[in-house]
Amino acid sequence: MDHATLAMILAIWFISFHFIKLLFSQQTTKLLPPGPKPLPIIGNILEVGKKPHRSFANLAKIHGPLISLRLGSVTTIVVSSADVAKEMFLKKDHPLSNRTIPNSVTAGDHHKLTMSWLPVSPKWRNFRKITAVHLLSPQRLDACQTFRHAKVQQLYEYVQECAQKGQAVDIGKAAFTTSLNLLSKLFFSVELAHHKSHTSQEFKELIWNIMEDIGKPNYADYFPILGCVDPSGIRRRLACSFDKLIAVFQGIICERLAPDSSTTTTTTTDDVLDVLLQLFKQNELTMGEINHLLVDIFDAGTDTTSSTFEWVMTELIRNPEMMEKAQEEIKQVLGKDKQIQESDIINLPYLQAIIKETLRLHPPTVFLLPRKADTDVELYGYIVPKDAQILVNLWAIGRDPNAWQNADIFSPERFIGCEIDVKGRDFGLLPFGAGRRICPGMNLAIRMLTLMLATLLQFFNWKLEGDISPKDLDMDEKFGIALQKTKPLKLIPIPRY
């Protein structure tokens, strides 16, 4: 066969292949959810913008609550309403439970070593069991109430000192330090930061870098063939951040395992690290899995909690009548001097409503971590094709006008007298997800948010630093897995008693 014949055969094959592919694509497109027309090669990448949650919410207003996009070569389905989320999690959770893996989280094989990114599998189920039984079980959380109250007491003392000096409190940083020390005490029996040290800010920046890089739009995700070259450098940056955080964990672990460590002889700290090391010795976990499990827990348990707390205080400073109402409720239940106990939370419905309303408008994660269709799945009358990426836009669902009256207005009263909760059963409010992938740290996060908020409202009034009017407060946000305020909230505490 001469070269000309071979070239002709190859050309015919190439044209035929792409013609058939085009026909198949056109037939399949008719079954896909509606969406904006993609451009050649890049698809709908230009529609993403710097704040994808807002861009996709605007597209949903045009095309409907379930839309399809082609981001480069990746078919992406976006869920933007409570009705679609309900059908997805109640009826289609199983075939839509696996993950699309962002190129960035392949750094250090993170996607192979942690529960968040593993596919549903025996290994994933084992990790889930370890987390539910050994790490964040209700029994362990109940047994560690003393830790939580001690960390909240430290927060109170720090704020009291700032009040005496007339200094403003960086609300997000203070909440981050409290959350970080709670987790480090629970897991390692040590504190990793102090309110007046630079260490807390360094940790906060490191954790935010991880959250931002994982959530950031990435050309290597739109065109997987580019993954090996990491065109935006995101994977390299994330690998560096992982290494820095793991180095902290390894320092603590090596000290615990040292032959002269008191915890290796007759005493025990009875903390989570002891449990993890016991599982390591029993070959149920590798050291790499322990390191990356800790990365996940400290990322999710510090940045998202502190960001949510900052948004709570932001909304209350903009709505002083709601802050006063919450303070009055706390006074009626606790009086002036009694510090809140977790058993008191049930008697503070308005405070709980404030937290729920904040989670509705400012969910801890903007999108649930991306899911992947194992097969063609019918959803809301359309076909989600095999291997498509599914994004659940929590930010849009929380503002779904079909699920919420005056959806853009901060109104805790909407939760008074109703049974809506955040445990994945009410599909207009899914801050921690739903189904088999629901966040295992949900109960700890809610307890800490409530304790911190009740304490800071019980003992202090608050005003903005400078001459800014609350209604002029900057509400701009930085996009990552979580949404942080672009400009940190700094408030001056004023003792109430």
UniProtKB/Swiss-Prot annotation:
Enzyme class: oxidoreductase
Its membrane topology: Single-pass membrane protein
Pathway given in the UniProt record: Pigment biosynthesis; betalain biosynthesis
Transmembrane found in the keyword field: yes
Inducing or repressing factors: Regulated by MYB1.
Regions crossing the membrane: 4-24
Any single Gene Ontology cellular-component annotation: membrane
EC number per UniProt: 1.14.-.-
Major subcellular location class: membrane
Cofactor(s) the protein requires to work: heme
Keywords, in A-Z order: Heme, Iron, Membrane, Metal-binding, Monooxygenase, Oxidoreductase, Transmembrane, Transmembrane helix
One Gene Ontology molecular-function label: heme binding
Keyword Nuclease included in the entry's annotation: no
Location of this chain's protein in the cell: Membrane
InterPro entries: Cyt_P450 (IPR001128), Cyt_P450_CS (IPR017972), Cyt_P450_E_grp-I (IPR002401), Cyt_P450_sf (IPR036396)
Top-level taxon of the source organism: Eukaryota
Family classification: Belongs to the cytochrome P450 family.
Annotated function: Converts L-DOPA to cyclo-DOPA in the betalain pathway. Provides the cyclo-DOPA moiety of all red betacyanins.
Further comment found in the protein's record: A frameshift mutant replacing 108 native amino acids with 27 new residues followed by a stop codon results in an inactive protein (AC P0DKI2) and a yellow mutant phenotype.
PANTHER family membership: CYTOCHROME P450 76AD1-LIKE (PTHR47950:SF12), CYTOCHROME P450, FAMILY 76, SUBFAMILY C, POLYPEPTIDE 5-RELATED (PTHR47950)
Name listed for the protein in its UniProt record: Cytochrome P450 76AD1
